């Protein structure tokens, strides 16, 4: 049952949407479904990241703590992940390359949610065995990062 949910979720994920069934198979096999209640934290800013996540059901806010000039902190919503046609990936991208990664924001469930999680170390091993998949994923990452940079620049221009 979980493999069906995982496959359907990964098909909706920006990062994996273009993979064939055969290419997606090793990723489905290592992925897991995690369930959270409203208010649960999936991962926290400043902590070491080890997984990538894709929202299956529910809603998750990405929150960033920001240090203010008076020494206090504020929390800002960076992005809200919803059950859309094309889903964003969240978590620790750099560990796919074997690099340590500290989470740059926190992921908090706004309502009961299910996510598909993948340990980055397992993903890296799967990619190392299948260089063609790795190439497709890294090409997709470049396009996703380009879009996010464009979005960030557009947001800065409104300040």
Set out the residue ranges of the language-model regions.
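Cytoplasmic (intracellular) domains, linkers, and terminal tails of multi-pass ion channels
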Residues: 2-8, 26
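Regulatory nucleotide-sensing modules
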Residues: 11-65
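Cyclic nucleotide-binding regulatory domains
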Residues: 41-110
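A small-molecule sensor/coupling module
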Residues: 95, 102-104, 120-159
């Amino acid at each position: 049952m979980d493999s069906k949910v995982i496959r359907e979720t990964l098909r909706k994920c920006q990062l994996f949407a273009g993979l064939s069934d055969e290419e997606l198979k090793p990723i489905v096999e290592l992925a897991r479904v995690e369930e959270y209640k409203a208010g649960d934290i999936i991962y926290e800013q400043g902590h070491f990241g080890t997984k990538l996540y894709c929202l299956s059901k529910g809603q998750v806010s990405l929150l960033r703590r920001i240090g203010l000039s008076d020494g206090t902190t504020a929390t800002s919503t960076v992005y809200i992940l919803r059950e859309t046609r094309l889903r964003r990936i969240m978590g620790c991208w750099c560990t796919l390359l074997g690099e340590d990664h500290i989470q740059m924001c926190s992921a908090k469930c706004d309502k009961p949610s299910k996510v598909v999680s993948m340990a980055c170390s397992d993903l890296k091993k799967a990619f190392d065995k299948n260089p063609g998949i790795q190439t497709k994923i890294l090409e997709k990452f470049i396009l996703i990062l380009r879009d996010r940079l464009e979005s960030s620049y557009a947001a800065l221009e409104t300040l």
